[in-house]
Amino acid sequence: MYLLILFIPLLSAFVTGFFGNFLTKNGTTKIASSFIFITCIIAYIVFYEVCFCQAPCELTLGYWINAASFKLLWGLKFDSVTAVMLVVVLTISTVVHIYSISYMGHDPHINRFMAYLSLFTFFMLVLVTANNYVQMFVGWEGVGLCSYLLINFWYTRIQANKAAIKAMLVNRVGDISIIFALVSIFATFNAVDYKSVFSLAYVYANSTISIFNYDLNILNFICICLFIGAVAKSAQVGLHIWLPDAMEGPTPVSALIHAATMVTAGIVVICKSSELFEYAPMALLIVTIVGAITAFYAATIGLVQNDLKKVIAYSTCSQLGYMIFACGISGYNVSMYHLTNHAFFKALLFLSAGSVIHSMQDEQDMRRMGGLLKVLPFTYSMFLIGSLALLGFPFLSGYYSKDFILELAFANYTIEAHFAYILGTLAAFCTAFYSVRLLLLTFFGKTNAHQAVFMQAHDAPLLIAGPLTILAILSIFIGYFFKDMAIGVGSDFWNGALTVLFTNNATIEAEFLPFTIKIFPVVISLLGCVMAIIIYDYCTKYLMQITNNSFFRELYIFLNKKWYFDKLYAETIYQNVLYLSYNPLYTVFDKGIFNILGPRVLTNTLEKLSMYVSEMQTGFFYHYALIFLISLTILIILSSINFFILLIILFILFFFIFKKENK
């Protein structure tokens, strides 16, 4: 049964991709959705057996690579982390498939779309079920490929082409780093399977590697390489630039990428490698700092975005920062808990945004909306639930996980943890502000939409409303019901799938923090909500005066330009690489030196050589015999064959030649 979890999505991708034109749109969508739904049911059975019955399972299918000392088995590992990810991935994938039946129903290429979605799901399942790093890398590359295909689904749009190429190239940086990590793991442990590597981690805790005459702890090096891969895949600061542009794909793709698949891959790899990270303190320090900066950075950019989907995209980037710095302070269980909660309310937000965009004739600018509460009441209620869960409103799913991450950071008595707490709290304020701003600009006030568009706006049909309702229920209740299992003191839910050294465990301290510390993030979030309501509801006439102020105008430009990351990369990397590629390499080497020394010299040499050879065609047999003799002599000198044997052969040949000439 466990094998069906991988086999059915692959079969769905194969059938819809190769036979979709014979099955019609209706048949293709039903087959793909049914296959993924069946897989989702199996995933819940696996979740029950592995997590509740404490029965982790590992399957070995056979040898994949068997070369000298490198032996690699193709196997599947079903532990608690895998079981949770199976439920998250397949639940989101199921609702996205059903949602796409209505949302993409008008598209003539829906067969290809369904095939890509199923293939995306398959590769994510390969990643989370792998029992070794090489097999994990197959899934890692697969989700990268499928993200390229889905972002570039409407391939006639130039912006979609650019966004897909950008996502692919940025993720190549992380992929190269993952390859370095894999090579280092095999060179150190002489194995790549999780069981062997993790069992030997403590042995190499103090081993070093020399890089440019600098001794670096080998586990620090491996974990930093793994983390750089996670930075690219999970859109952390520095390699985050592909994520907002990924909004060029269809909205269901955005929900699948940002909620359950590609961006969570980096978090899963870090959590599965917790045994290595616990013995790599420098790597944990870097993880904490980068995650905290990302959480704050992305939240500040979300304050000034006007594109509906990009606001939600930057909120994803910010929430991923929370998960990353939770891993950095050894809160792997809290990170997985927040990943689970975030998946459902973020999918709800994206699919609700798709419902709004669909009803507004593909309009995404919030400044051209407004007043949609009366015409889209159901979609508004779904958006409200998702936004409140995102900002951490009490007793919704985001409240339990995000606040506990901040409590855990406060309870870790280290400088980097308190740094993460400060930036995380500021990010919580910004998150609340832009979440309420999104609701006010989209659903309240007077409409700024074109009259014809506004009059034709309609609420979500059944195939869109159904998935939204399921996600809304999960966004409300999953955090409460999952809390004690995932992060409760003394819980054995993870059953050894996550490793935390006792010196790094601050869960008990976080449970007994003062009430003022626990309530502080909630107060900050409510303050952000109130400020957004005051500015965008009661004081809208003062917005222009605020932007006329030089300080606020420069601040707005700075945030709207995304902290000038795109400008920095364009001027320092893109332009220099383009200049270097064209001027020295293309014009001097390719068109100059290589062209002269290569084709031109070769053609001239061959032409002169052929003329010289043609002059040797005298028609006299003894001339040809002389050439033959000289050539054969040269070959004899250059060869290692016995010289006397060749002399005998040469004598016999000349005997027959001269005998024939005398005749």
Spans of features found by a protein language model:
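Predominantly late transmembrane helices and immediately cytosolic-facing juxtamembrane segments
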Residues: 346-350, 418-459, 466-470, 483-487, ...
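Aromatic-capped, Gly/Pro-kinked transmembrane alpha-helices
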Residues: 49-63, 67-80, 489-523, 538-663
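Membrane-entry segments of alpha-helical transmembrane domains in multi-pass membrane proteins
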Residues: 1-7, 23-34, 70-88, 126-139, ...
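Alpha-helical transmembrane segments
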Residues: 13-17, 97, 299-301, 438, ...
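Hydrophobic transmembrane alpha-helices and their helix-loop junctions in integral membrane proteins
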Residues: 92-136, 145-455, 474, 480
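Membrane-helix interface "capping/anchor" motifs
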Residues: 21-27, 104-109, 303-310, 642-644, ...
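Transmembrane helix-loop-helix hairpins at membrane boundaries of multipass inner-membrane proteins
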Residues: 1-3, 7, 18-115, 192-213, ...
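Hydrophobic alpha-helical membrane-insertion segments
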Residues: 34-51, 174-186, 383-391, 467-487, ...
